[in-house]
Design a protein with these regions (language model features):
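Generic helix N-cap/helix-start motif at coil->alpha-helix transitions
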Residues: 26-34, 66-68, 170, 174-177
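Extended amphipathic alpha-helical interaction segments
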Residues: 116-237
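C-terminal motif of bacterial Sec signal peptides marking the signal peptidase cleavage site
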Residues: 17-18
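Conserved small-residue packing positions in alpha-helical repeats and bundles
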Residues: 38, 73, 80, 87, ...
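Inward-facing hydrophobic residues that define packing positions of alpha-helical scaffold repeats
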Residues: 54, 61, 91, 105, ...
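Alpha-helical segment of the N-proximal tetratricopeptide repeat
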Residues: 32-53
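Terminal, low-structured helical/coil segments at or just beyond the last alpha-helical repeat
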Residues: 161-162, 221, 227-230, 234-276
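Short, charge-rich amphipathic alpha-helical segments embedded
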Residues: 56-78
Length: 276
């Protein structure tokens, strides 16, 4: 019995030594740790938390910074659009619901504030990418999020003036963010409005041409800048910042007819905003 106990003890010691000598987990607070946390939050459907981790990674220059910047351009752009679109749905409900419009108004304010935060993260990431990353091909170093490319059916409730139940509010928000992040990914890899094509691309390592990536980013910047228009948050300075970054991104890529047309469209919107 003593021999058996000794053998068991030796076996356990060898096992523990082998575990201890294996690959160690990243230290908390390091870029590798933050990257893993971003991936975990992303796959759990917590897009805003994933975005926060990506912002934290970019506080220093490290090996994860370029990947985090590319990911944030796609992620934060989708988050901003998701919050903004959902806010518009509640704004519609506020106009239609004459029983408790204030409840809808609170959601509008909260969602547009969250959209504004994500929009600024998105804008900053695009600015840094244009200035620091000359790559001709952009590697999308992340996989697809959970959720669906289809617009959530539950969105019809706030649009129509019916307040979602308490348990449905967060579920709708999560579904909406996932939906718009997927849309942002489609746009970034040149498969806009074609989720089937996007799914096939993500079966292997995904790279997209710089032109496609930055044209998509510029289009997203311009679309989301409407959040700061007079009939929404009425913040002309942020509108100007976003639209100018969109123009700068477009001017850094080959001047195709599409790029020139979008630049003209953005500059016309800037002139209209300045004239108010």
């Amino acid at each position: 019995m003593k021999i058996q106990a000794l053998l068991l003890a030796v076996t356990a010691a060898v096992f523990l030594a082998a575990c201890a000598s294996g690959p160690s987990l990243p230290e908390p607070g390091t870029p590798a740790f933050l990257w893993n946390e971003a991936r975990h939050a992303y796959h759990s459907g917590d897009m805003p938390k994933a975005n926060d981790y990506l912002s934290e990674i970019q506080q220093t220059d490290n090996s994860f910074t370029p990947r985090a910047r590319i990911w944030q351009i796609v992620l934060a752009g989708g988050i901003a659009r998701g919050y903004s679109d959902l806010a518009d749905a509640y704004a519609s409900g506020e106009r239609l619901n004459h029983t408790d419009p204030l409840a809808f108004h609170r959601h509008v304010n909260e969602l547009r504030a969250s959209a504004s935060h994500a929009a600024m993260d998105f804008t900053q990431a695009v600015h840094a990418f244009v200035a620091r990353d000359p790559s001709t091909d952009v590697q999308l170093g992340f996989d697809l999020p959970p959720g669906s490319a289809l617009e959530p059916v539950a969105l019809r409730k706030p649009y129509g003036g019916t307040m979602p139940l308490e348990g449905e509010v967060l579920a709708l928000q999560t579904a909406m963010l996932e939906h718009d992040v997927i849309g942002s990914i489609c746009l970034a890899n040149g498969s806009a409005n074609d989720s089937a094509q996007m799914l096939s691309k993500f079966k292997a390592e995904v790279t997209t041409p710089r032109f496609t990536f930055l044209y998509a980013a510029a289009k997203n910047l311009f679309d989301i800048s409407g959040l700061f228009a007079l009939n929404r948050l009425d913040q002309p300075q942020k509108f100007q910042v976003m639209t100018q970054e969109a123009v700068s991104a477009l001017q850094s890529i080959p001047q195709t007819d599409d790029a020139k047309s979008l630049i003209k469209k953005i500059q016309a919107a800037q002139k209209r905003a300045a004239a108010r």
